[in-house]
């Protein structure tokens, strides 16, 4: 079972602590004294799929030198302002990176392993995935 504890600090500023003891400060977007809760969801999705894709590429002997994921989301205008669409863009830099290995790693992450992105997808959020490979000599 996963657990989390949220503690109020001041105004709308809170600190969340994971069951593993890691903390993050959150706040409303208006106050901007911490990460917003909806931003946390995007960070979670980006982090989840990043860990998967990097692990899969390493297992397939891809020489990754740098890796970045950029996540953008569109939300509904009216409350509860849920995500309508989330776009995840992977940027992989390395030596002789295989297009097919990258595509397979992203597919495995987004369809089998990354519970965060699969949860959003199953809840009705439209998920889009793109990537670019920068091969360095």
Task: Place the predicted regions along the sequence by residue.
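Extended beta-strand/beta-hairpin segments
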Residues: 1-43, 54-137
């Amino acid at each position: 079972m996963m657990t989390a504890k949220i503690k109020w600090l001041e105004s709308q500023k809170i600190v969340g602590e994971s069951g593993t003891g890691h903390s993050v400060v959150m706040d409303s977007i208006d106050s901007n004294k911490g990460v917003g809760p909806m931003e946390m969801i995007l960070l979670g999705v980006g982090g989840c799929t990043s860990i998967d894709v990097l692990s899969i590429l390493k297992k397939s002997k891809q020489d990754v030198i740098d890796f970045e994921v950029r996540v953008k989301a569109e939300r509904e205008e009216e409350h509860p302002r849920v995500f309508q669409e989330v776009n995840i863009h992977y940027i992989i830099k390395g030596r002789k990176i295989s297009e097919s290995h990258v595509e397979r790693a992203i597919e495995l992450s987004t369809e089998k392993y990354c519970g965060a992105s699969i949860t959003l997808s199953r809840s009705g959020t439209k998920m889009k995935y793109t990537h670019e490979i920068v091969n360095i000599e």
